[in-house]
């Protein structure tokens, strides 16, 4: 009987990571999904991550507590206003969480090595994104090289691969591929500054990119938004 490969998928509960979860699951690998409670103000996404994991058979899901809010430095984890009027494309926005993807991937790598898994999946995107440095292809390439230099598995000839299936897709293309795979986008949240019920503000950069993506895909966004 052939050995079933295993993979660790970073699952935030947002649109992109829910799509990546389905993509990874479709490969037939044994999927381990990892989410983080890191002090973010948009914690509703963790409930969405739980529901996304439960929607697929055989997915093991863990939520790890990691208080990046202790460091501050981001509008997502500190008392800093979330921009609502667009962002300057020439600067890194205040919604950037210092080294977040480096931290998340490092922990996913540690779990993968303990599981004997050689595949990591992350929903970074370099097309419709907000200018975060840890969403670029060069960062992913560098991390994969580091992963294989820094681990027992890597030096013993069992290298890791970091998969970024969304890296060159527009938000509309991501949505179209996700719908084809059966993603329920009503069970995802993207807003940086939602209300207490998890409804999106419709004005932050995450909401703007999401709404634009659904409009370009020609389908309505099923997530709730604040309004009169």
UniProtKB/Swiss-Prot annotation:
Biological process terms in GO annotation: queuosine biosynthetic process
Biochemical pathway: Purine metabolism; 7-cyano-7-deazaguanine biosynthesis
The record's free-text note on cofactor binding: Binds 1 zinc ion per subunit.
Catalytic activity entry: 7-carboxy-7-deazaguanine + NH4(+) + ATP = 7-cyano-7-deazaguanine + ADP + phosphate + H2O + H(+)
NCBIfam families: 7-cyano-7-deazaguanine synthase QueC
Known role: Catalyzes the ATP-dependent conversion of 7-carboxy-7-deazaguanine (CDG) to 7-cyano-7-deazaguanine (preQ(0)).
Protein's UniProt name: 7-cyano-7-deazaguanine synthase
Species: Magnetococcus marinus (strain ATCC BAA-1437 / JCM 17883 / MC-1)
Name of the gene: queC
């Amino acid at each position: 009987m052939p050995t079933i490969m295993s993979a660790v998928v970073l699952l935030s509960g947002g649109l992109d990571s829910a799509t990546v979860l389905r993509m990874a699951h479709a490969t037939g690998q044994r999927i381990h999904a990892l989410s983080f409670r890191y002090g973010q103000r948009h914690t509703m996404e963790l409930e969405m991550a739980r529901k996304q994991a439960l929607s697929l058979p055989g997915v093991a899901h863990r939520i790890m507590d990691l208080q990046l809010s202790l460091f501050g430095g981001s509008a997502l984890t500190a008392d800093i206003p979330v921009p609502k009027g667009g962002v300057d494309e020439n600067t890194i926005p205040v919604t950037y969480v210092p080294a977040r993807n480096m931290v998340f991937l490092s922990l996913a790598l540690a779990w993968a090595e303990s599981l004997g898994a050689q595949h990591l999946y992350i929903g970074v995107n370099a097309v419709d994104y907000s200018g975060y440095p840890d969403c670029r292809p060069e960062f992913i390439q560098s991390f994969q090289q580091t992963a294989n230099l820094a681990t027992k598995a890597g030096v013993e000839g069992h290298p890791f691969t970091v998969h970024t299936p969304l890296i060159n897709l527009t938000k509309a293309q991501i949505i179209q591929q996700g719908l084809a795979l059966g993603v329920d986008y009503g069970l995802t949240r993207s807003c940086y500054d939602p209300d207490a019920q998890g409804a999106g503000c419709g004005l932050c950069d995450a909401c703007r990119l999401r709404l634009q993506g659904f409009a370009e895909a020609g389908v309505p966004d099923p997530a709730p938004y604040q309004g009169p």
